[in-house]
Design a protein with these regions (language model features):
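Phosphate-binding/switch region of NTP-binding enzymes
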Residues: 171-286
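Catalytic P-loop NTPase motifs of RecA-like helicase/translocase cores
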Residues: 96, 154-155, 205-206
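Peripheral, non-AAA+ core regions of ATP-driven protein-machinery
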Residues: 21-27, 38, 242-245, 252, ...
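A short alpha->loop->secondary-structure connector
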Residues: 79-80, 104-111, 162-171, 213-218
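Terminal-proximal interaction/regulatory segments of ATP-powered molecular machines
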Residues: 294-336
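Phosphate-binding/switch loop-helix module in NTP-utilizing enzymes
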Residues: 117-193
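Long, well-ordered amphipathic alpha-helical subdomains in the mid-to-C-terminal portions
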Residues: 275-304
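The Walker A/P-loop phosphate-binding site
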Residues: 2-110, 122-131
Length: 336
């Protein structure tokens, strides 16, 4: 037995390991397809990956930017990819309904909604569940995903007590409670290989030299989440009818891909995320497609209008084209 192995055994830490054996709970062993190629690229540096399967990912934005619909779309993708999988959805806003899930193709028998009011409630229930998973033999565990929608609406036990007593004082402990919660959760979720997706609100920083958005909840989430994406939207119209939103996604923080990268996705009110939206721009940026006057020139020299590509994306984004784009995406989005 080599020296490092002896030190690991002496520590009594069953999760410790040599780097060349893989880091249990830290290394990303898989990804969850988000339903959008360009959003996958933003999160993971590949069109074909997406949300890390053992990390905390946060979608942050102002009210009505589509954070809940975005989350439900990702939940649907997770359940579709994992026929035995389940989702635990912590709802702090009473924002979701049964219809919202079923309309997005989510199997209602495989998702449970947990209404919670305070950070302490969420922490206790979530940690109890994760500890139960960790106590279960790995061969008997089912794929699981946890969603918190949203962190920004969680109160604290102190704030609830102050309101009940008629006190009008600001809760100065909230940021610390949140920080402590995710300090514990982050490591346990990694060990249990459970991905967490959460939403949060942003607000304008008063007095900033340039317009600046800040995340709600203090600094705790910034350190806990592996990935934070800020969302902003504009209406998507067809024939003067609003059919959805065009959402600009900026990488606020990431441990896997380059920060401050930006992509735009299309969120349709009826069909959810458009898998192919944004690929034309990505292909142009990568040099796979070329702009030729009013048309797009494909690698084989064919020239077509962008409108036709968007109408039949599967015809033009063949497996070979997607592979070429993905190679460029990995160079552009990943570190090193």
């Amino acid at each position: 037995m080599d020296f490092l192995k002896e030190m690991i055994n002496a520590s009594g830490n069953k999760y410790a390991s040599k780097v060349d054996d893989g880091l249990d709970g830290a290394d990303v062993s898989g990804y969850i397809d988000t339903g959008s190629y360009v959003f996958n690229a933003l999160l993971s540096g590949s069109l074909f990956d997406g949300l890390p399967n053992n990390k905390i990912t946060c979608l942050a934005g102002e009210s009505a930017t589509g954070k809940t619909y975005f989350s439900i779309g990702i939940v649907a993708q997770f359940l579709a990819a994992n026929p035995e999988g389940v989702v635990l959805y912590f709802d702090t806003e009473q924002a979701v309904t049964s219809d919202m899930f079923t309309e997005r193709g989510v199997d209602p028998k495989r998702i449970a909604v947990f209404p919670v009011e305070t950070v302490e409630e969420f922490r206790h229930q979530c940690l109890t569940i994760v500890d139960k998973v960790l106590a279960t033999d790995e061969s008997e565990r089912k794929p699981m995903m946890i969603v918190l929608d949203s962190l920004g609406m969680l109160s604290t036990a102190k704030e609830m007590n102050d309101v009940a007593e008629g006190k009008n004082t600001r809760d100065m402990t909230r940021a610390q409670v949140i920080k402590g919660t995710f300090r514990v959760l982050t490591l346990k979720l990694g060990k249990a290989k459970i991905p967490m997706l959460m939403t949060n609100h942003t607000y304008d920083v008063v007095g900033a030299y340039v317009p600046t958005k800040e995340l709600g909840g203090g600094s705790g989430l910034k350190y806990a989440a592996s990935t934070i994406v800020t969302l902003s939207k504009k209406k998507d119209k067809q024939d003067d009818e609003v059919v959805g939103n065009l959402i600009t996604c900026k990488l606020y923080k990431s441990r896997l891909t380059k920060e401050n990268k930006i992509v735009q996705v299309q969120l349709n009110f009826d069909s959810g995320l458009n898998r192919y939206y944004g690929l034309v721009d990505l292909a142009l940026d990568c040099g796979i497609f070329k702009k030729n006057s009013t048309k797009i020139e494909l690698p084989d020299g064919t020239k077509v209008f962008e409108k036709h590509i968007n109408e039949e994306p599967q015809k033009y984004f063949t497996d070979e084209i997607l592979k070429q784009i993905d190679e460029k995406v990995q160079e552009e989005f990943k570190y090193g």
